[in-house]
Amino acid sequence: MRNRYSGLLAIVLTSSICANAQSIDGKVMENDSIPVPYATVSLLQASDSAYVAGVIGGEDGSFSFDTNSSGKIVKVSCIGYKTVFLPAAAHMTIHLLPSEQALQGVTVTASRPSFKMEQGQFVTHIQGTVFSQLGLATDVLQQLPLIDTDGIKVLGRGVPLVYINNKRMRNWNELTRIPSNMIKDVKIDMNPGAKYGSSVRAVLYITTIKPVGEGLGGSLILSENVSSCWNTTGWLDLNYRRRGLDFFVNTSANTFSNSHYKRQDVYDFQYKGQDIHADYSGDGYNSAKTGFVSVGVNDQLTDRQSLGATYTFSRVFSNSADQNYRNHVWQNGAFSEFDTRSTQSSQNGNHNVSAYYENKFSDKFSLNVDATYAHNRANSRQIVVENRMDNRSMLVPATKSESDMVAQRTVFTSTVANGKLDYGLVTSWTRFQQQYCIENEDYSGLLKTNDNESKQSAAHVFANYSRSFGRWFTQLGLKYEYIDYKYYAAGKLRDESKRTFRNLLPSVSLSYSQDRFSLMLSYNIYTNSSSYSQLDDGLQYISDFRYNKGNSQLQPTKKHSVAFNASYRDLLLICNYSYGKDAVVSCFDVMDEIPAVLSYGVNHSFSSVYTGLSYSPTFFKIWRPSWHVWIHKQWLSYNGMEYGRPQAGLQWKNLVVLPRQWYIVLNASGNLKGHSNTYMAQSSINVGMSIQKNMKNLWVKLAASNLFNAKEKGYSEYNGVYTSHWVDNRQPSISLTISYSFNPAKSKYKGKTAGEDELRRL
């Protein structure tokens, strides 16, 4: 009896100690002196073995969880060792025994939902799951619910802002330099609130795991792609960390970027009472050489203070496009044909300098300051030669553009009434200049030399408050925005294009979560300004049958958006209704001077709705499919024409996990015929697949994209004008990618990049 009570007392004391532990840490060892590196450590609920969290152990066998140990079990597995289950404790030393028979490279991880909603954000945990073995961040994103198969768009919201460890991503190539096994989690915020730019409709947060050890680390990636042409790309990343100081260098080069495509365009319109049908078809060839380098430093001054700076330079060293077309024209029953050859060469260079300072004064108050300067310069020269039966003509248009942008962003974060208050100031100044000229002196057509410049000063102050009430979470935001825009033609201020805007932009959201069931309702007002090239009034040559002109008097679009999201287990429903006041509509009209059409943009208000349903289960522990069905409907009428045909689509993603660390990905996406703005997109389907083998610090992937060579095709109809295009990109393309990493250590740079809206417009 005494032994029974003693045992019961020991259990009670052990449970009490575990309940008081607020964190769990330990090491995985083979014996007292040999650690087991990179073991899979999972935290489970003791009551039902439900998955709580997971990590990959360090090279020294260490692991940790930021949660208490009460009522939890630690599961540890590693290739070549027996899997063990132990009660969780604050400090653990776990010894693994070699398995009697190796598991042939099979790593079993707990089944978990693909996503869940936490405080209004959709969260997908990557660390310790099969997603962490897919290669690169781009490969992970392509397989996640709510993300398009191209990995760069949020379904129903478009291209998001991306933050990597709280650092604003400047170049999409950065995603190709993050190994998937370094990603802790991915969060999608579809209600960013007032603290971001006025046009931001979604924010993607990628958090990487804390690197193990110090010293020099890096990765090298080489990729070879072939379709009808060859394409060679390479990336090299180096990172040196010593205590709190962190130096990093990221580089990439695309030395042989070539492509070949076939294109056909058709135009039907009336010119001065005569019916005109014109088309051209032929081949195009592109070739480019590009490079990118980014260097930076981060200094963790104390546990609460850090600062850093980054310089990034990207350049298109050469970009040439060669097009050969056969033109056919029927004008009032008379037929003619001629040949056109267009040769275009271009270059550009971009400089970006950013710096940040972060100070967590206390647990209830912090400061983050960012500053950014960006300078861009580009030039292009085109030679267009026409060979007709009776003559030969030449056109040599050239374009030069230059821009500068300076911005700062100051954000304070305070704890107020058990909630979080973000408030601050963002300012920016932007200059964009574009020159367009015709270099051949014998030209006597419509195109004129023009030199136009845009200047804008902008500022906004914001406050964003968020708080949890049990299972409820609410967010309230308010932003005041001031914009002063000026447009200059040939150095003279255009009064009719000068304007000042003052906008008050609210945002509100309410969400509810219980276990694996979540709801969210939100309302936001967004503003979106046209790109600076869209605001340029200069006339530009596209083809013999088409010219383009900007519109300096375009107003910013103010979009009212109401969104509803719901999730239950592996099901997710997203609905979004938006009304765009002064939205930009693409239009065509017949020119007065010559038989050709002119494309331009105008402001016109209309509404739209997007609804999508996703299902992302796991079957047989090795197959992770994801289906997403969506429909988009707009109510757009302009100039007597209706553009309201709904468009529906489907995405089907598949990830299959095989023994010996082999992975197969098969993704398909397609859409039915329907309107997007004034453009009627035709039905299409795109299928891609890959097979990958992982080997410690090395992985190899063989992939094929656009297996059935889906064509780009569609048309637009206006009053008296019909245009269509068809593009064959000569695919599928086959690629081989090899990646090697050593002592991986991702940078801790925490800058968020001020002026993200202006960088997008430029």
Residue ranges and their predicted role:
Residues S42-L44, S77-Y81, H91-V130, T149-D150, ...:
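Short, acidic, small-residue-rich periplasmic hinge/interaction motif at the N-terminus
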Residues L44-A50, I73-L86:
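A short, solvent-exposed loop/turn motif at the edges and junctions
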Residues S47-S62:
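Short, acidic Ser/Thr/Gly-rich low-complexity loop/linker segments typical of extracellular
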Residues A90-L97, T109, A137-V140, W172, ...:
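N-terminal periplasmic accessory domains that precede
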Residues T138-R170:
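Extracytoplasmic beta-strand/coil segments of soluble accessory domains associated
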Residues R168-G193:
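Short acidic/polar hinge/loop motifs at secondary-structure boundaries
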Residues T290-S318, R341-A490, S511-M520, D570-C575, ...:
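Face-selective signature of the C-terminal outer-membrane beta-barrel domain
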Residues E453-Q456, E496-R499, T527-K581, V597-V609, ...:
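Outer-membrane beta-barrel signature, preferentially recognizing the C-terminal barrel domain
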